Design a protein with these regions (language model features):
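Short, glycine/acidic-rich beta->alpha junctions
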Residues: 14, 189-190
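Short glycine-enriched, charge-decorated loop/helix-capping segments at active-site entrances
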Residues: 178-185
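SAM-dependent nucleic-acid methyltransferase catalytic core
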Residues: 4-7, 48-164, 168-178, 190
Length: 192
C-alpha cells in the first residue's frame, strides 16, 4: 500500500481511526478526519505544542483500583456525563485500555457503552502516545471532525496529493453488525 501512496504533498484520511497508515506516510501536509469527536479531541490535546503534561494526566486514571468493573462503570458514566473535552479525552484513553477488546462504541444517545474488559494490568500507552505526538508536531497537520463527504477536507487538492479511504467495514453477518463508531453510526448506504 505505501508504495502506491508514495510521498504526497497532501495526505487526506477521511476515516483516520488510529492514524496507523498516516504514521507511515511521508507527506508534506496531513488532513486527518474522523466522525468520532472524542477521538479527534484526544488527538488535538495530545499534539498541543503548549501542553506537555497531557500524557502524564491520562496516566492519573491508570491506578490499580481503577482496574475494577465498578470503578470502570463509574468512570464511564463520568465520561458520558462530562462536557469537558479535556477530561473526556483523558478518560477516553482510560476507557480504551480498560474496556472489552479496546472497542469504541456508542449507543443511540451518544453514550460510550463498551463493557469492562477484565484486563490483568492495562498500561498507559505512553510511548505510542509520545511517538504520535512527536510525529505530528514535526509536520503540518489538520485534525477535523466532520462528515467524510465535507468538501473542506478536499479543498485545494491537486496533482501529487493522496486521499486514502479506509471506511468502517461492512459486517460479515447480521451478528457482526457494528457501525457505532460515533453517536450517528455509519450506515451501509454511506459505505457503498
Amino acid at each position: 500500500l505505501l508504495p502506491l501512496i508514495g510521498t504526497p504533498k497532501t495526505y487526506v484520511e477521511p476515516f483516520a481511526g488510529s492514524c496507523a497508515t498516516a504514521l507511515n506516510v511521508d507527506a508534506k501536509r496531513y488532513v486527518m478526519n474522523d466522525i468520532n469527536a472524542d477521538l479527534i479531541n484526544l488527538y488535538k490535546y495530545l499534539i498541543n505544542p503548549n501542553d506537555d503534561s497531557f500524557i502524564q494526566h491520562c496516566g492519573d486514571f491508570f491506578r490499580p483500583e481503577n482496574n475494577d468493573k465498578e470503578e470502570y462503570i463509574s468512570l464511564r458514566k463520568y465520561f458520558n456525563d462530562s462536557t469537558d473535552t479535556l477530561e473526556r479525552s483523558r478518560l477516553f484513553v482510560y476507557l480504551n485500555r480498560h474496556c472489552f477488546n479496546g472497542l469504541t462504541r456508542y449507543n443511540s444517545g451518544g453514550g460510550f457503552n463498551v463493557p469492562f474488559g477484565k484486563m490483568k494490568n492495562p498500561m498507559l500507552p505512553s510511548t505510542a502516545m509520545m511517538d504520535f505526538r512527536m510525529y505530528f508536531l514535526m509536520r503540518k497537520h489538520i485534525f477535523a471532525n466532520v462528515h467524510f463527504d465535507d468538501g473542506r477536507l478536499y479543498a485545494g487538492l491537486g496533482s501529487g496529493d493522496v486521499v486514502y479511504l479506509d471506511p468502517p467495514y461492512v459486517p460479515a453477518s447480521d451478528t457482526a453488525n457494528f457501525a457505532s463508531y460515533a453517536k450517528q453510526g455509519f450506515s451501509y448506504d454511506e459505505q457503498v
